[in-house]
Design a protein with these regions (language model features):
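Acyl-donor (CoA/ACP) binding surface of acyl/acetyltransferases
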Residues: 5, 13-22, 26-63, 67-74, ...
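Generic, well-ordered alpha-helical segments
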Residues: 56, 67, 84-91, 105
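Short amphipathic alpha-helical segments enriched in hydrophobics
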Residues: 68-72, 79, 103
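Conserved GNAT-fold acetyl-CoA-binding loop/helix
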Residues: 74-97
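A short helix-loop-beta-strand connector motif used in the catalytic cores of GNAT acetyltransferases and
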Residues: 84, 97-111
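Short, charged low-complexity intrinsically disordered segments located at boundaries
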Residues: 90-102, 122-131
């Protein structure tokens, strides 16, 4: 299940590469440092002001389920799969365990955003491709915490961590074109708009375009 990015305003997702039949599946094994290695010593990212990004933990499953339920109307606008998958504490536990399994193989890393002890959002890096030193990022935040710059803060810190710790070269990001808030986050963080995928997502019987962004480790990015 790809939690992309939530909030009534902020939802961004990421998909696997289409060339799976032509190329080997992405793996982090060619990176100088792999996700499994990093996670053995991973410490929460302190964002300041009492906000932290922490690796996914099964103990946080009830809080994750509550967050998705409370924001289901907003999530459903752009990423209905999240609402359909995380429906209660039990399904949230399954999700967290699957995320941990995939993290142990280096395929992705999901972090949860906390305001003190309150889980208020999520940031995920997936499709980690060590051969090409690339990955995709997605994120969401609850409506109670939107409008405060927290998505920009959290995703920005996560991106910098991924570039420096994993030595990635490229991070991609996709969001529904109608989600102007998510696109604004991408622009603020120095992502370049690469193109538009027409009618690529069917949500509630309506086709939507996706915007495709990327940022390179060599890009010059000013303050957010």
């Amino acid at each position: 299940v790809p939690p992309h990015q939530l909030s009534v305003a902020v939802v961004s997702g990421c998909r696997s590469a289409v060339g799976a039949l032509r190329h080997p599946p992405p793996t982090c094994e060619h990176l100088p440092v792999t996700l499994p290695d990093l996670l053995t010593t991973f410490a929460p990212l302190d964002l300041g002001g009492g906000f932290t990004l922490r690796a996914v933990d099964v103990a946080d499953a009830p809080a994750l389920a509550a967050l998705v339920r409370a924001n289901s109307a907003h999530l459903g606008r752009f990423i209905p799969a999240v609402v359909a998958t995380i429906v209660d504490d039990e399904s949230a536990v399954r999700h967290c365990r699957e995320m941990q399994r995939l993290q142990s193989t280096g395929e992705l890393l999901e972090m949860h955003l906390f305001d003190g002890d309150v889980l208020c959002g999520s940031v995920r890096m997936r499709d980690v491709d060590g051969r090409n030193r690339s990955a995709y990022i997605g994120y969401f935040i609850g409506t109670d915490h939107q409008g405060r710059g927290l998505v920009t803060l959290a995703v920005g810190a996560f991106v910098e961590w991924a570039f420096s710790s994993l030595q990635l070269h490229r991070i991609g990001l996709r969001c529904v074109a109608a989600n102007t808030a998510s696109a604004a986050v991408a622009h603020r963080l120095g992502f370049t708009l690469e193109g538009r995928l027409r009618d690529c997502e069917l949500i509630d019987g309506v086709f939507h375009d996706d915007l495709v962004f990327s940022r390179l480790s060599s890009d010059r990015v000013g303050p957010h």
